């Protein structure tokens, strides 16, 4: 292979890898309720900036994603994924629950 062609091939491969990494970083943070537990139980999110949070209900019954501290409350039907628009949060920890099922362990957003 000729050197200029090899350099072009390497440059294109590097650009594709960088673009793929950038897309992964652009994906909104996501939590999932499955088997009566939130996954992950703790999620780090950006502080002092608004963002979208994806909430997926993989259980057989409707849930109510609720955070009293953040004034967010949304019903999520079985098998549904919703987007919750989150406010800019000061650094700290913020709890969320499934208000329909109080026995479900709470989850935590950690704003950093």
Predicted features, each with a name:
Residues 25-48:
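N-terminal edge beta-strand
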Residues 1-7:
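Positively charged n-region of N-terminal signal peptides that target proteins for export
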Residues 58-78, 107:
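Histidine- and aromatic-enriched segments that form or immediately flank copper-ligand environments
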Residues 7-17:
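Bacterial N-terminal signal peptides
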Residues 41-61, 81-89, 94-95, 111:
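Beta-strand cores of secreted/periplasmic/IMS beta-sandwich domains, seen most often
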Residues 25-30, 77-112:
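Extracellular/periplasmic metallocenter environments
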Residues 34-41, 67-71, 79-83:
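N-terminal post-signal-peptidase region of extra-cytosolic proteins
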Residues 18-24:
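Sec/Tat signal peptide C-region and signal peptidase I cleavage site
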């Amino acid at each position: 292979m000729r050197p200029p062609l090899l350099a072009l091939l390497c440059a294109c491969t590097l650009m594709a890898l960088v673009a793929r990494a950038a897309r992964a970083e652009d994906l909104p943070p996501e939590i999932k309720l499955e088997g009566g537990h939130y996954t992950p139980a703790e999620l780090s999110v950006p502080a002092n900036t608004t963002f979208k949070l994806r909430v997926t209900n993989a259980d057989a019954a409707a849930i109510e994603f609720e955070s009293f501290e953040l004034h967010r409350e949304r019903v999520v039907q079985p098998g549904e994924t919703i987007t919750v628009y989150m406010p800019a949060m000061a650094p700290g920890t913020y709890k969320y629950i499934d208000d329909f099922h109080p026995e479900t362990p709470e989850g935590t957003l950690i704003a950093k």
